[in-house]
A protein has these predicted regions:
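Sparse recognition of residues in long alpha-helices and their boundaries
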Residues: 86, 93, 167-168
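Short, Lys/Arg- and Gly-enriched loop/turn segments at beta-strand edges
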Residues: 160-168
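N-terminal intrinsically disordered, low-complexity, charge/repeat-rich segments that act as generic
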Residues: 2-90
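Non-DNA-binding regulatory cores of transcription-related proteins
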Residues: 90-156, 162
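Short coil/turn segments at secondary-structure boundaries
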Residues: 37, 158-159
Length: 168
């Protein structure tokens, strides 16, 4: 992990924040596109198959269930995209709250939506190709532990102590 003084020494905080959010947004847009493609494919397969041959014929029903599953994934991805687009408008934070990007001495978090792990190009002279971030929702226990903290504050979560080094 880079030291606090090294982190963000190349870009200002606002630009870095935008870069991180855009990386997460690109990931979610890809998830949405894939879900839409799969949903359309399942619908097309169901249409091509035609009506059920008899009441025990479950292929069409299976395709419709798949379509519905992908439709739900698409809806969730689109909801996350809307949240991320809204967060692009926020300035960097001084305290950990929804929308903040938090760098601890152990991990990096984006407190936004439950998206999971994503990568961002590393902004340092150190030869590390990408930083790993975790986009987490407000319902997660780690979010609750971080909420309200400031730079220099520590939390203990699952037996691991982490110190907040930077908040964007």
């Amino acid at each position: 992990m880079p030291e606090n003084s090294d982190f963000l020494s190349i870009m200002d905080r606002t630009q870095r924040r935008i870069q991180i959010i855009q990386a997460c947004l690109a990931l979610q847009q890809q998830v949405a596109a894939t879900a839409k493609q799969e949903m359309d494919s399942a619908q097309q397969q169901s249409n091509d198959y035609g009506a059920n041959v008899d009441r025990y014929d479950s292929y069409r029903t299976k395709m419709m269930r798949q379509r519905d599953m992908y439709a739900k994934q698409l809806s969730n991805a689109n909801a996350s995209i809307r949240v991320l687009q809204e967060l692009l408008r926020h300035a960097p934070f001084d305290v950990v709250e929804h929308g903040a990007i938090v760098v601890t001495d152990k991990q990096r978090f984006f407190l936004s939506a439950g998206i999971g792990k994503f990568m961002v190009p590393y902004q340092s002279p150190v030869d590390v190709p990408q930083e790993v971030f975790f986009a987490i929702s407000a319902q997660t226990p780690i979010y609750m532990a971080l909420k309200g903290k400031r730079v220099g504050d520590s939390i203990t979560f699952n037996g691991m102590t982490q110190t907040v080094q930077e908040i964007l």
